Amino acid sequence: MINDVVILVGGSGTRLGSITKYTPKPLLKINNISFLDQLICKLIKYKFKKIYLMCSYKKDKFFKKYHKIFIHRTKIICIDEGKAMGTGGALFKIRNKIKNNF
């Protein structure tokens, strides 16, 4: 069974232009609920133990809202990517925390 989920939320959303100037793309709202909240709600139904958010751009917003909170026994952990290095860099940084293949 897969216990951990990794969500890459570090992109700066440059293709969205001014829309993401103050709000990171995953925190943009669709029907008054952020995309990330919608995704987390769907993942919680599958009873994962941990959700890792790989943060870079405007990381303080993710840490403030999500870091080390529990939702129905699922722990959300924010990881600071440091300098954004793309998908490979984010996954390389978290490689020692993930117990399962994914």
Task: Name each model feature, range by range.
Residues 2-7, 15, 29, 33-102:
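Conserved N-terminal catalytic core of the sugar/cofactor nucleotidyltransferase
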Residues 11:
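Active-site glycine-centered loops adjacent to acidic/histidine catalytic or metal-binding residues
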Residues 18-21:
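Conserved catalytic-core motifs of eukaryotic protein kinase domains, centered on the activation segment
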